Amino acid sequence: GHALVAARQKNAQPVSKITIVPHTQGALGYTMQLPEEEKFLMTEEDLLTEIRTLLAGRSAEEVVFGTKSSGAANDIERATDLARKMVTMFGMSEKYGMMGLATVQNQYLDGGYGLNCAQDTAAGIDQEVRGIIDRCHEDALAILRKDREMLDQIAGYLLEKETITGGEM
């Protein structure tokens, strides 16, 4: 799912490796994307592309199996973090515009951040984040449904080879 959704978006980083070989860190496999050039800034569309790609694994489960598993937990966490930063730190919120609603609390250790807003604003932030996640999820589902045959071909090839790298894609 990740590789196909990435490939169908014009500004996604190219996929360099896909594997279904489990790793000791708990990953059941992964899709590796490497940027073609070093990038220091991400546009709003770049961030949405990344979120769509992160949500594509769960979306593929829904399209293929009609169900959900816990396998996408880290992807969902990362997508939610990006969406939250869009709203609270990057000024990319429809509702709040260019307001800095969060600050980095410990930039030298874990990089966690805290909200600088009223409680009702925090609830509104959650709604904005949910909206971004829902739209990106729907976009990923649409791509996978449209290209279902290709999704099945990639999955079949992966089951046979276990790992696909650059030239094979």
Predicted regions and their residues:
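Soluble catalytic regions of large protease machineries
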Residues: 3-169
